[in-house]
Amino acid sequence: MARRSKGRFIDGIVLLDKATGMSSNFALQRVKRFFNANKAGHTGALDPLATGMLPVCLGEATKFSQHLLDSDKRYLVTAKLGQRTDTSDSDGEVVQTRPLEFTEAQLMSALEHFRGDTQQVPSMYSALKYQGQPLYKYAREGIEVPREARPITVFELNFIGLEGDELTLDIHCSKGTYIRTIIDDLGEMLGCGAHVIMLRRTQVAHYPYDKMVTLEQLEALVAKAQEEQLDPSSLLDSLLLPMDTAVADFPEVNVPDASAAYLMQGQAVRVSGLVADTLVRITLGTERRFVGIGEMNQDGLLAPKRLVVLHDQAKAS
């Protein structure tokens, strides 16, 4: 007998504004509990030190979390110049202290080095795995392991200000970019060392900054619902963004009702007007109900790749 899943069927994306000092998984579990969701997943961890946008996918939205993981990100970062730490942030131990002896022109020249397409060697204090273990576990044991440089793109690197020994930058970058590594490398280029003291993720993909909510706000809504003897979902669910916003950049293909049943059974259906090998967002019928993503093949057929479970059908079956 199949084990019954706990929690309710609720699909959507919460733009959580993660607070500092907590892990991304801790934040995820709190959101899942507030919404009483049957399943949840985040779209790229933030370090405990970091704050800001952490999209949390609930229910069927978890099927599309990888697309947000692969998306561009934007960060506001403040670095302390003159001190290098073993973790490249303020959670680590200071390993070197040097005076600030660079000019403004040298700073601007150094910043230019990081713009565009570059190669980055990930920090030992990262979640990347080597022989099945996260790098940070080796680092904590004092073990250095080989890491290959990876291609990254910094689309924008904007100088915000320099006050004393604190430098603030705005960075728009590709997936897999380690801001701590940029700051550490910048400090070495300037000859003084540097580490991150504040890191805030301000954007993931196209999601708006003003749609973020904190755990405290969610907790307050749950408390309000209890006081007014309401179901918490009546106050919380309006905060959810539609799950297809995770793949909003994909072109839409609307499948007519006549072909919908075939598609939902995993069969390819014929559509026209799109190039082969194109990933698309699939909607059904006149209601344009989002049901997943698919790919156009060489024969002009739309092959489903990732379909959602329609809960009204699930209950009926």
Curated annotation (Swiss-Prot):
Enzyme class, UniProt record, top EC level: isomerase
Residue ranges crossing the lipid bilayer per the database entry: none
E.C. code: 5.4.99.25
Record's keyword annotation contains Methyltransferase: no
Known catalytic reactions: uridine(55) in tRNA = pseudouridine(55) in tRNA
Pfam families for this protein: TruB-C_2, TruB_C_2, TruB_N
GO terms (BP aspect): mRNA pseudouridine synthesis; tRNA pseudouridine synthesis
Keywords from the named record: Isomerase, tRNA processing
Active site per database record: 47 (nucleophile)
MF terms in GO: RNA binding; tRNA pseudouridine(55) synthase activity
Superkingdom classification of source: Bacteria
Family: Belongs to the pseudouridine synthase TruB family. Type 1 subfamily.
Chain's role: Responsible for synthesis of pseudouridine from uracil-55 in the psi GC loop of transfer RNAs.
The protein's name: tRNA pseudouridine synthase B
Natural source organism: Shewanella sp. (strain ANA-3)
Upper lineage: Bacteria, Pseudomonadati, Pseudomonadota, Gammaproteobacteria, Alteromonadales
